[in-house]
Regions:
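Internal maturation/activation junctions in enzymes
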Residues: 1-20, 24, 46-151, 270
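Amphipathic alpha-helical segments within well-ordered protein domains
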Residues: 37-41, 72, 189-193
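Long, low-complexity intrinsically disordered regions
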Residues: 329-355
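Intrinsic disorder/low-complexity segments
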Residues: 312-330, 334-337
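Glycine- and acidic
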Residues: 14-24, 41, 45-57, 170-174, ...
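Catalytic alpha/beta core of large soluble enzyme barrels
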Residues: 2-11, 80, 121-125, 134-141, ...
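Contiguous, well-ordered alpha-helical segments that form the cores/surfaces of helical PPI scaffolds
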Residues: 27-42, 58, 97, 153-156
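Residues immediately within or flanking Cys/His clusters that coordinate Zn2+
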Residues: 68, 358-361
Length: 366
């Protein structure tokens, strides 16, 4: 994979000479993953568990380790990237934080199960000391090796879950330019067939809500495994991203899906946790925070939203546009001020102490 991606840099046609020079100066590649949630389900491991975070951390390390060896091998064969400076280059294996530290920051004290310990014990050993020695001898071909992309489209083509995201819903309605259609998670359907529960009436009932968290007729094991993006607490979303981020050179595309009733304070806490855990970026999406969105959880919610939008449009047509806009902005501003004030002075003080002054930035070396 590293050789293929490195060759793409030379084979590609660049629209601007300036762009080509910039890319070839660092020769960054971005190998990532998808299908993470489906893999966990196949292993019988819930997404929102310490077991899943342990697997994420050590699988990410294994991927980075092999890519580092491959890129150093390419440097030995073809030379390191032109901008390589051994004094300034800081690889992930020198900056990655221990998993136990991440869990401690997030307030998680559980240990992995024997099952996961057994899985991890079968992973070949990594030797970062040897990698460092080889790096000193030959340099490295690519300034960046890994990047986890959203994989929204290619995961649909591959029939698997996207990126490192949990499944969005066991059934949902997707809206695209050519129309809308209902999707049911492929692996979930397979599990229903095993239990002889794949009756149209059962699937239709589940599709109404998109989640099986509160369906007593579905076995508890499945309810625990098929936890959807909105069933999972935000802290587990952030922990997954942080676990992968330690061994990913560039950014990690990950959305923290929050329920419609999430407050400004809830969002603030997610951003702070992501920063403390060393995530390079974070995305939060509160359900139904936009008048239109690509995916709605469950068919029932989707149709209800469409009806609400239709009624809202009719109401707006009956009012003066300027008056409608003024009211909306005033209400939104008042709501935001109220939420921020409820965070209290303690939260603001915590942020100020963590960030320090502009001349004393604690998040970078400058």
């Amino acid at each position: 994979a590293a050789r293929f991606m490195d060759n793409v840099i030379d084979a590609a046609r660049w629209p601007l000479e300036k762009l080509e020079k910039a890319v070839k100066r660092t020769r960054k590649i971005g190998i990532g993953v998808m299908g993470w949630a489906h893999m966990l389900i196949k292993l019988g491991i819930p997404y929102d568990s310490v077991d899943a975070v342990y697997l994420a951390y050590y699988l990410a390390e294994w991927i980075e380790y092999n890519l580092a060896l491959a890129s150093i091998g390419l440097a030995r064969e073809k030379g390191p990237f032109p901008a390589y400076d051994p004094e300034r280059y800081r690889p992930t294996w020198r900056t990655a934080r221990p998993l136990e530290e991440l869990l401690s920051v997030a307030g998680v004290s559980s240990k992995p199960s024997e099952k996961v310990v057994r899985i991890l014990s079968g992973r070949p050993r990594v030797d970062w000391g040897t990698v460092d020695k080889l790096l000193g001898l030959y340099g490295i071909r690519n300034a960046a090796l890994t990047s986890i992309a959203p994989t929204g489209t290619i995961s649909i083509i591959a029939g698997t879950s996207s990126s490192i995201e949990p499944i969005f819903a066991v059934a949902f309605e997707r809206h695209v330019t050519v129309g809308s259609f209902i999707e049911v998670d492929r692996i979930f359907l397979e599990e229903l067939r095993k239990l002889e529960l794949d009756e149209p009436a059962v699937i239709a009932k589940i599709a109404e809500l998109g989640s099986i968290a509160h369906f007593p007729f579905v076995p508890k094991r499945l309810r625990r495994l098929f936890r959807t993006a909105h069933d999972i607490e935000p802290s587990w979303h952030v922990l997954h991203q942080a676990a992968w981020q330690q061994w990913v050179c560039a950014g990690v595309s990950k959305t923290v899906n929050m329920r419609a009733e999430a407050s400004v304070g809830d969002v603030w806490r997610v951003y702070m946790l992501a920063w403390k855990l060393g995530c390079k970026g974070i995305t939060v999406y509160r359900d139904r925070s936009k008048s239109r969105q690509v995916i709605y959880v469950g068919v029932k919610a989707s149709r209800k939203r469409v009806d609400h939008m239709r009624k809202e449009r009719e109401d707006q047509d009956s009012r003066k546009p300027a008056e409608s806009m003024r009211t909306t902005h005033r209400d939104l501003a008042a709501e935001s001020r109220g939420e921020i004030s409820r965070l209290g002075e303690g939260a603001v003080q915590e942020l100020a102490e963590a960030l320090g002054d502009a001349k004393d930035c604690k998040t970078c070396e400058y």
